[in-house]
C-alpha cells in the first residue's frame, strides 16, 4: 500500500494567479487594482509582514495598489510566500477620515478576497456566528469604536483550513482596516 502524499502549503489553496480574479471582480465594483509588483529585497517585510505563527518563510511578495474610479488611493492587496506560492494574503484599506467613511470599499474588497482565496461558503458556514462577512466587519467596527485600544483584532480560524485576521487600527484620525488570510 502506498502512503498518501501530503501536499505542501504552497500546493493547496490560493495562488499568486488569483490576483487576476480579484482584480476582475473588484473592477465590477468600480475598484481598480494595479498590476502586481514583485518584491524580493530587504523591504519585503514592509509589504508582506512576518508572522510568528507561520513556520514557513516569506521571501517573495507581490503588492498591488487599489484605487477608486478617480484614481484616488484606497489601499493595497499583497500576497507573500516563496516562488512556489503564497502562504498569506493581505488587504489594507485606509478609511480616513472616519472609521466608516469607506465601508462599502472595505466590504467589497474583504468579501472578494475571502470568496476567491478561501471559499464562497461564508453564508453556509457562518464562522464565528456571523451570517456574512459584512456582519463580521460591522461588529468589529462597533467594538473598535467603543475600545480605548489603538488596534482591534478579530480572528476566525479554520475556515477551509485557513485563518482570517481582521485588524482595525486607529491613530490620529487615521483608520486602517487590514484583512490577513493565512494558509
Residue ranges and their predicted role:
Residues 58-72, 139-160:
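Short, solvent-exposed secondary-structure boundary motifs
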Residues 45-50, 71-78, 138-143, 158-167:
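Short small/polar-residue motifs
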Residues 1-27:
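N-terminal Sec-dependent export signals
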Residues 28-49, 119-156:
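Short glycine-rich, low-complexity/disordered patches
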Residues 19-104:
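Extracytoplasmic beta-rich ectodomain segments of secreted or membrane-anchored proteins
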Residues 154-174, 179-181:
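Short, exposed beta-strand-loop hairpins at the edges of beta-sheets
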Residues 73-144:
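Long, charged/polar, surface-exposed segments that mediate recognition or autoinhibition
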Amino acid at each position: 500500500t502506498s502512503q498518501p502524499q501530503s501536499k505542501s502549503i504552497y500546493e493547496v489553496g490560493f495562488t499568486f494567479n488569483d490576483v487576476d480574479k480579484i482584480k476582475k471582480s473588484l473592477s465590477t465594483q468600480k475598484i481598480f487594482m494595479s498590476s502586481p509588483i514583485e518584491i524580493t529585497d530587504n523591504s519585503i517585510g514592509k509589504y508582506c509582514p512576518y508572522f510568528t505563527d507561520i513556520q514557513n518563510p516569506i521571501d517573495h511578495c507581490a503588492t498591488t495598489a487599489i484605487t477608486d474610479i478617480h484614481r484616488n488611493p484606497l489601499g493595497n492587496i499583497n500576497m507573500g510566500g516563496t516562488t512556489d506560492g503564497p502562504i498569506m494574503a493581505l488587504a489594507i484599506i485606509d478609511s480616513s477620515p472616519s472609521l466608516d467613511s469607506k465601508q462599502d470599499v472595505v466590504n467589497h474588497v474583504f468579501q472578494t478576497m475571502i470568496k476567491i482565496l478561501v471559499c464562497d461558503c461564508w453564508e453556509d458556514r457562518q464562522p464565528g456566528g456571523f451570517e456574512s462577512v459584512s456582519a463580521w466587519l460591522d461588529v468589529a467596527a462597533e467594538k473598535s469604536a467603543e475600545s480605548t485600544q489603538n488596534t482591534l483584532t478579530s480572528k476566525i480560524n479554520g475556515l477551509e483550513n485557513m485563518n482570517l485576521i481582521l485588524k482595525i487600527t486607529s491613530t490620529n484620525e487615521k483608520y486602517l482596516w487590514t484583512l490577513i488570510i493565512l494558509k
